[in-house]
Amino acid sequence: MADMIEAKSLRSGQTIFGPNKEILLVLENTFNKTAMRQGIVKTKVKNLRTGAIVWIEFTGDKLEQVIIDKKKMTFLYKDGANYVFMDQQDYSQIEIPEKQLEWEKNFITEDSEVTIISYQSEILGVNLPELVPIEVEFAEEAVQGNTANMARKRARLVSGYELDVPQFIRTGDKIVISTIDGSYRERYNK
């Protein structure tokens, strides 16, 4: 039997089983106690199977913690509708369907290091580093005279993701991108 935890003791980053045995990652947790009632715990969670983010209320509940496995792997290649990753320790490979990587695929390139999250043998998702360097496949030409504060132009990365970048970025440059919101952070210097 897995460890049980009181709802009011939940912390960001913990994983629990939800009311319908879904695997939930705790994002935020607030505990409100009034004089005449039992405390209410409002918890913002992400369903690791569906990706849905919702608020759930608990009242004095004991919840079952879920022990998830995290394994560092390297992206090798895309095979049709699947992304293939390899464990650098034992060279085992796994395939993850593209539909399970809707956001993450924008930042995965050859040799990208990721953390695969699983429960028992079920792949739940991929964690990316917060910032990743990635090459610009195409950048629009800078418009001469357009030097207003924070002038931007469109660019497409080698992954196919499009975003706004500063005017000085050119095709072939490597830039650092936030995997949280997909925004440009800086020119990659290495």
Curated annotation (Swiss-Prot):
SMART domains: EFP, Elong-fact-P_C. It is found in: Cytoplasm. Pathway: Protein biosynthesis; polypeptide chain elongation. One of its GO terms (molecular function) is translation elongation factor activity. Involved in peptide bond synthesis. Stimulates efficient translation and peptide-bond synthesis on native or reconstituted 70S ribosomes in vitro. Probably functions indirectly by altering the affinity of the ribosome for aminoacyl-tRNA, thus increasing their reactivity as acceptors for peptidyl transferase. It holds the Pfam family EFP_N. This is Elongation factor P. SUPFAM superfamilies: Nucleic acid-binding proteins (SSF50249), Translation proteins SH3-like domain (SSF50104). GO terms for cellular component: cytoplasm. Keywords: Cytoplasm, Elongation factor, Protein biosynthesis. GO terms for biological process: peptide biosynthetic process. The lineage of its organism: Bacteria, Bacillati, Mycoplasmatota, Mycoplasmoidales, Mycoplasmoidaceae. CDD domains: S1_EF-P_repeat_1 (cd04470). The keyword Cytoplasm applies. Belongs to the elongation factor P family. The keyword Cytoplasm applies. PANTHER family: ELONGATION FACTOR P, ELONGATION FACTOR P (EF-P) FAMILY PROTEIN. It comes from Mycoplasma pneumoniae (strain ATCC 29342 / M129 / Subtype 1) (Mycoplasmoides pneumoniae). Coiled coil: none annotated.
